[in-house]
Amino acid sequence: MPASPYFVHPDQVTAFGFDWGQLALTVGPEVNGAKRFSGGIVTVQPGGGHARHNHPGAEEIILVMSGTGQQMVEDDAGTPITAEVGPGCTIYVPESRVHSTLNTGPTPMTLFVVYSPAGPELALRDLPDFRLIPPKG
């Protein structure tokens, strides 16, 4: 656990590991008591990505910090809208909307994600390739 709830590094928390990469929740009820949202650092390995999914009852913000990829978000009619994304791009995923991310670049893609309200990301623990990655620091 981090020494301070206000300053959290991804290496200080248990991460969610998957075949495509990992999610290290650095803010949320179980990390530092945040009540209205949760978030953290997602790392997507080259050629990796997560399948189409949604977070029932929650909105999501995705900020691409490094790497390049392809992001899909369904519009109001359920039509997939896809865009090439890179560092600095912010993606808004409306409440309960289906979306997916694919790393199309040669290096890991790093994202900062925020879920509001907190909680839907915990359903990722039910995925077949889920595993816990212990803190490094």
List where the protein language model places each region.
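A short, N-terminal "cap"/entry segment at the start of jelly-roll beta-barrel domains
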Residues: 1-37, 51, 83, 126-137
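Short histidine-centered beta-strand/loop micro-motifs
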Residues: 28-29, 51-56, 73, 82-84, ...
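Short, charged/polar surface micro-motifs in flexible loops or helix N-caps
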Residues: 32-35, 45-49, 66-70, 117-121
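Conserved short histidine dyad/triad with adjacent acidic residue
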Residues: 40-56
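A short hydrophobic beta-strand segment most commonly corresponding to one strand
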Residues: 41-42, 61, 92, 107-122
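A generic "binding-loop/recognition-motif" signal
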Residues: 48, 57-58, 97-98, 107
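A short beta-strand-loop-beta hairpin characteristic of the jelly-roll/cupin
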Residues: 59-87, 97
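Conserved metal-binding segment of the jelly-roll/cupin
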Residues: 85-104, 116
